[in-house]
Amino acid sequence: LDDAQTALTGFGQGQVTATPLQIAMVSAGIANDGVVMNPQMVDAVIGNDLSVIRASENTEFGRAVDAEIADEITSAMVASVSNGAAQGARIDGVDVAGKTGTAENGNRPHTLWFTGFAPADDPAVAVAVVVENGGGQGQSGSGDTIAAPIAKKVIEAVLGR
């Protein structure tokens, strides 16, 4: 990468490619004091008598950042939801940590993102939402107005709110 491409990559543009699962892993790693875990799609396999046939084990993928850095990122993400660019994910009584993204696609509709976790001080859920084709709003939609409210609904469902 040249200097310009490196700069674009630094804020998520250019040649950055990531799946929603990978972005959810980023948020989960921040929520987990900088330690990224391997993703699991199944918590346990249950038999027809409701006994656990096989339970999944949590395994560490690796440390992405020091705990102190993860804490600083968490604070910035909470501020983004509380009074910044990600207010579409605000939930009364819950500190949500989040980050929006609006990827430009030339003259085509934007790709809208939100990733985050909650509660920020004792995380129970990490989420990533991607909405393609501008969520029906062309180039006027944003991660805050389209993707963040979807994430809010998911977080509320997980937290039973």
Predicted features by range, described:
Residues L1-E60, M77-R161:
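Active-site beta-strand/loop architecture of penicillin-binding DD-peptidases
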